Amino acid sequence: MTFQQRALTGLLLAGVSFSSLAALTFQTYNPGEKGIFPVSSTLISGEKQAILIDAQFGTKDGQALVDMIKQSGKELTAIYISGGDPDFYFGLEPLVSAFPDVNVLASKAVVQHIEETKDRKLQYWGPILADSAPSKVFVPKVFNRSEFSLEGEKIYVKELNTHQSYLWVPSQKVVLGGVAVTAGMHVWTADSQTPEARSEWVQALDKMADLKPARVIPGHYLGDMPQGIEAVSFTKAYLGQFEKTLSKAKNSKQVVAEMVKAYPTLSGQQDLELSAQVNTGERQW
């Protein structure tokens, strides 16, 4: 472990000397229908300190996170980015400006993915985000550990260095599902382009359910926050239906038609259409 890694670890473990452990609280910001992606960012707070998990897609929503953190009255000790897709980190710019001394951290795999894809992602999404696009993309520092603490309470990174990584807070029996968990909308599968990748995704969901969480915060959701493990069960069932449909369909239009038939009330059909095009080989992503 390098000196820098030890310093970052010390920062995240700084609360372990607290003699009594206050229950952690979870405040989730999600732009819902107002966002291009309804992505979740969660402020995990102890008595005095807090850690932000994920940083939104655009700078306007990133500024909303700044306001939420300041209103909490807690000392922000770190920002942890759980996924390498731009809706997890493009909103960092106002956060880094407001909290310049706070480390932005991510696993080795997430940092590598961001470094490899950020330029072309900004080229594609910048015009769509318009005045909410970042003028500078911030890359997190590598923090390749599977656990850290907030005021003595352990937070575990499960499935570290995979596309399905998520956070587990055993003291509160809460899962932050990250990119692996969706609710109330079609599941984005454009980044999981093989049966093997989707099978690994399902296996991660099974392991998540085995933890018997009391609450799972989806990485993306529309509508009300689902209860218990509803979002895990939904995501797994959706992936199963998608796999079955994809194996029989001749083109993306057939995939879309069958998935809409199976899930007629879901939002996010544009996500389904793009995912179907990618997974049928009609479009590169």
Predicted features, each with a name:
Residues 1-9:
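Bacterial N-terminal signal peptides that target proteins for export
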Residues 17-20:
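N-terminal signal peptide c-region/cleavage motif recognized by signal peptidases
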Residues 210-215, 223-285:
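Accessory terminal helices/loops
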Residues 60-105:
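Active-site metal-binding motif and surrounding structural segment of the metallo-beta-lactamase
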Residues 23-71, 166-179:
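Conserved beta-strand hairpin/beta-sheet module of binuclear metal-dependent hydrolase folds
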Residues 36-38, 59-61, 84-89, 111-114, ...:
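Active-site environment of divalent metal-dependent phosphoester hydrolases
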Residues 57, 115-233:
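Metallo-beta-lactamase
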